[in-house]
Amino acid sequence: IGGSPFEVTVHTSPGPTCGTFSHLWLSLIGSEGETPPIRVTDGNSHLLPGSVCPVRVQASSPLGRLILVRLRLEVQTRFPNLDWHCSRVEVWRVSKGQGSDSETQVFLCDRWLRPADGDVELRSGKLCLLEEEIEEKLKQQRLRQLQHQQQLIRWRIFVGGAPQCVDVNSLSELGPNLLYTQKSPATNLYYLNGFTTRVESWKSFSELEMIFTYSAQQNDIARFVKAHWMEDWYFGYQCLNGSNPLMLRETRHLPPNLSVTSDMLRPFLPEGCSLENELQKGNIYLLDYEVLDGVPANVINEKQTYLSAPLCLLHLNQQGQLLPIAIQLQQKPGPQNPVFLPSDSGYDWLLAKMWVHSADFQCHQLISHYLRTHMMAELCCVATLRQLPDAHPLHQLLLPHVKTSLKINVGARASLLASKGLFDQAVGSGLETLPVLLSRASAKISYRTLCVPEDLSDRGLDKLPQSFYAQDALRIWDAVHSFVTSWVDLYYHGDDAVQRDPELHCWLTDINTHGFSNGFPQRFHTRAEVAKFVTALIYSCSALHAAVNFSQLDFAFWVPNCPVAMLRPPPQAKCAVTEDDIMSFLPDVNTTCRVLMALNGLSQPAINFVPLCHYKEAIFRDDAHRRLLEEVQAQLRAISDAIAERNSQLELPYPYLSPERIENSVAI
């Protein structure tokens, strides 16, 4: 006796490039059997953008419960081989009764397919854990998918001692589903273009001011920075709220290699207070760029550049301002490594602060930005694609936050971080330093570093009223953590379910094996542990990236505030430094302009910008998912309103962690 007939409709997504000339073959797979492939694109049925192609499938024997739809594209002779974006396949079993079998089953696809992909199997039904799969065929389908992904997506060592990356040599190897992000056109810095070939030093501050006036006239934050960059209170503000708010930390003990005494610093502390008392009160903060110690500096325009590894002490005064009170430019103390103080001559002290900013730029670019956000996103993406099947709830939650990172990072390694790229030809640390910095920094990153509440508490930033990054980061963390906790609880009905999930633990093992190891969980025991770990990943790929990326140009536009390279060595003695001396330390004109134009491009959101906790993927239209999204989006709107109200009262607003400005992923 033959099986029931099925009415099938194949839905092509509506985008203008979603169609294909290829033929489509379709099979239905049930718990008891499957149909042979039938060609969908016959006669008048074509896979046009937004089209619906109907086909009737007659099963020769009973299929049982319908569980999978198998699709395969075949290139049509003499026609271009175009990728096809399938929205979904809907199947209706034709039967006399009107029971559950008569309902339409929806098999979501929502991705690009290619003839080279071979057979692609679509599932019907909700996301679930492996132990909840009833059908053996669905368990096998999960396994097949992971085996295929592990052959396709492999690990590669980029730098020894740092998180590994995806093993591809070109963007085309990633396939269309990992290439969808598009760069926005950068703001046109027209007046910088003509300077990118001028291989000479800046002549004066007035020359810098001329370029700045023409190029940054619409940038209110950059103009504020230029007006206040020499002031000590602003130096402290930038440590808290600039493009690199990850370096500063409270210290209760002076580093043994910092040559300061209580008497030396007494003039810069409140009357009657000693350095020891201020340390114990938690009023002393430290910037320590030890990671730069001893690394080779770049050669740019055939000129040797120089790096320092400064230590900088800052004091939290009674007005809530964080003021620098001592700067030592190298790690090893000695007579040729003086401690600069606010009481030194104006240009001596200014130059010392510029050296700190230059060191901070190197650490910002490679560590706070590339390592902490880009490499973290890629690590999570590769592990997710390799170890969590599509049907796993954490695969669907995480992928929108990480999948763009592969295209961005592969492109960066082929351009910005490649030989003769921007880092090689314009940045003081250069390519030779890159592996040293990444491996050193990776060894220092702990799990607590990635968890915002612990990180801010450990660094003493959660108590500072002027730390707007810290305030906003905690708000964002709490909202995302609440959302992720609800998502985890939706699918893990108890802690025992977490412990029994082999796919989850293979994923965690992959991250630990190819990523960080300092204090990271080796196994999950509770739902709370899973939610915290996933929140840390999502925060790193979204909010942290927004804070360290989209702020770059604002704080670097005024070149002396953020020297990307230094052309003279750090001073070995205190002396009368002049304005001309200051200018001679700055990078050449072409170097400066090339970096500013690159930062300008990096500061633009993607064309297809998706705000934090907004999702275009069809799976998020499920009723249960939609309710969770409504809750978190309402929380984020309230945070946006609170930040807008606060910023309206500030002379220099902090906008970077306002949720509507946070991209859901590393997409630039």
Label the model's feature ranges.
Residues 1-668:
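Noncatalytic interaction/regulatory regions of large eukaryotic proteins
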